[in-house]
Amino acid sequence: DDALSVESRGRNLRIGVHISDVAAWVEKGGAIDQEALARGTSIYMPDRKIPMLPTGLAEGLCSLVRGEVRPAVSIFFTATPQADILDWEITPSVVSVKRQLNYSEADSLAESDKSLRALAAAAGTFNRRRLENGAVQILLPDLSVRVYNGGDIQVKIMDRDSPARLLVSEMMIMANWVMARFLAQKNMPAVFRSQLHPRGRLYSGQDEGTLFQNWMQRRMLSRAILGTGPEYHSGLGLDAY
C-alpha cells in the first residue's frame, strides 16, 4: 500500500511517496514470510482474490488506512516546476493518512484541491519529459471484470488516462527512478530494471497512435532486463529504474 504527500518549497515541491513497511509486521524467515515467498504474488480473479499475505495483514496492519498510524518507508524528493530533482531522502517513517480517496473522488477534486493540483502538474511535466526522452506510451483499453455471487457479470472499461491515474502512475515511476539513483549513488546491492530500444516505433512523443498501432507497438517492445546495475529503460525514458 502507498500514499502521497506534498508541500510547497517556494516554487518547488517537496513530494513524499510513502510505502507500507510490511517487514515491520512479518518476521524474516517466519511462517508468514515463507508462505508469502512460496506464493510470490497476490492473484486477482473476476470472482475472488488469493492474497500473498493473510487478509488481516494485507487489508489491515500492512494497509495505510485513514486515521491509523502505520510504519512505512518514505521517499522524499524536491522537484522543480520542470520536474528536475534537486535532492532526495529515503527514510523509515511513521505515517497517518489524512484522506483516503478512490480514483473517481480524486478526479472530481483534481481542479479544486490545491495539493492534488500541484501533484497533477508535477506528474504531467514528468510524463512529458519522459516522452521527450524516448519513453514508449502504450494506451490500451483496461477492462475490469467482476463476477457476483448470483452469477451476474459486470464489465467496465477503466479510464487509464484520468488525471488521478496519471498522477499516481507518474509519482510511482518518479519514486522508483529516485530510489534507483539513490542505490546506484550509494553503490548498494540492488536489482535494477532496464529495457533496450523497441524493434520499431509506430508513433512517438505526445502522439497517442491508433488502437491498432498501440497493439502492434507493444509487440515490438524489447524484453525487460533485470540486472545489478542501472541501465537505460527505453520504455520509461529513464536512465535508471
Where are these regions (language model features)?
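Electropositive polyanion-binding surfaces
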Residues: D1-Y241
